Amino acid sequence: MLELLFLLLPVAAAYGWYMGRRSAQQNKQDEANRLSRDYVAGVNFLLSNQQDKAVDLFLDMLKEDTGTVEAHLTLGNLFRSRGEVDRAIRIHQTLMESASLTYEQRLLAIQQLGRDYMAAGLYDRAEDMFNQLTDETDFRIGALQQLLQIYQATSEWQKAIDVAERLVKLGKDKQRVEIAHFYCELALQHMASDDLDRAMTLLKKGAAADKNSARVSIMMGRVFMAKGEYAKAVESLQRVISQDRELVSETLEMLQTCYQQLGKTAEWAEFLQRAVEENTGADAELMLADIIEARDGSEAAQVYITRQLQRHPTMRVFHKLMDYHLNEAEEGRAKESLMVLRDMVGEKVRSKPRYRCQKCGFTAYTLYWHCPSCRAWSTIKPIRGLDGL
């Protein structure tokens, strides 16, 4: 109850100020006193958990005196913040339908009703509300941002692109990153139906929106591979190392396939060496170790792995080093113990999440471009360090 009382303090202050000003007018003193008593009665209903009676009383007061609009807007927002969305909708809907509101007040009511519908998951109704505000100077950016949330929630990617492009024109350049992702989402739909040409057209638009989009480059690489154009796939996938080196590990298996198809094993080793030098993660180190072992022998690979473990210690590289030691160990209890230890390390590596959102900390075993927790784009990266990649 005390929590609710504190939540009501802004409403009481606003209404008290208003009633004090109105009460100064002697000819309306009686009316002010009656409305003040009604307001206190409404608060009492709230404090006694009779919220519906309180809402009815406040709405009746609104019909008699539109000077309480701001107080009612605040009250509706309080209900929404407490999860009582139905009551918030009742209040804001009644406000919006009131014939005595000023133009500005009506826009405020529409805005808050749209947020109520968003909170209730009624996206079609919320969309209708915010569309009414997109041509209003003081409400335009906020309404477009709300619409952008709606279209992402409903996977209406072309609408999301249209809204985001309007925001870019209004100075919100950060939306370019999201626009590239929206084009990628559309491209995925066409890739699923084997319409690779249309998918590539969409990806090029994504690249135009954000030239640093690693996701666009990775998806272009996949499309080129599907079309058998391995040289172009290599060109696209290699761009990632300059766009976002933390995501290079997502390209390595595809690049390995492309270089094999092209018969360019030396160039593949050179790229891995570059990836290792730029500290892109354990995947590149382990792949290069395999090449060194095949070319120069197990001992050379072990020396290389030991050096990398000293520079950038990770459990995955340590697990690889244990494999080399096991291959050299003589049969006996020492080797058996080493095998147990290696298996324990391997299980730990497999059980650890591979990715983490840099914004909210959400962890996952697969890469998400759109964080399921905080809904941010491009914030999930491979985990680095001892337990990471």
Swiss-Prot record:
Function: Modulates cellular lipopolysaccharide (LPS) levels by regulating LpxC, which is involved in lipid A biosynthesis. May act by modulating the proteolytic activity of FtsH towards LpxC. May also coordinate assembly of proteins involved in LPS synthesis at the plasma membrane.
Example GO biological process: regulation of lipid biosynthetic process
Residue stretches spanning the membrane: 1-20
PANTHER family with a match to the protein in the record: LIPOPOLYSACCHARIDE ASSEMBLY PROTEIN B (PTHR45586:SF1), TPR REPEAT-CONTAINING PROTEIN PA4667 (PTHR45586)
Cytoplasmic side stretches: 21-389
Main location: membrane
Protein name from the UniProt record: Lipopolysaccharide assembly protein B
Topology in the lipid bilayer: Single-pass membrane protein
Residues that coordinate or bind Fe cation: C357, C360, C371, C374
NCBIfam families membership: PRK11788.1-1, PRK11788.1-4, PRK11788.1-5
TPR repeats: 35-68, 69-102, 107-140, 142-174, 180-213, 214-247, 249-282
Location of this chain's protein in the cell: Cell inner membrane
Family membership noted in the UniProt record: Belongs to the LapB family.
Any one of the GO CC terms: cytoplasmic side of plasma membrane
Keywords: Cell inner membrane, Cell membrane, Iron, Membrane, Metal-binding, Repeat, TPR repeat, Transmembrane, Transmembrane helix
Source organism of this protein record: Escherichia coli O157:H7
SMART domains (alphabetical): TPR
Pfam families: TPR_19, TPR_7, Zn_ribbon_LapB
Alphabetical list of SUPFAM superfamilies matching this protein: TPR-like
Origin organism lineage: Bacteria, Pseudomonadati, Pseudomonadota, Gammaproteobacteria, Enterobacterales
An MF annotation (GO) of this entry: iron ion binding
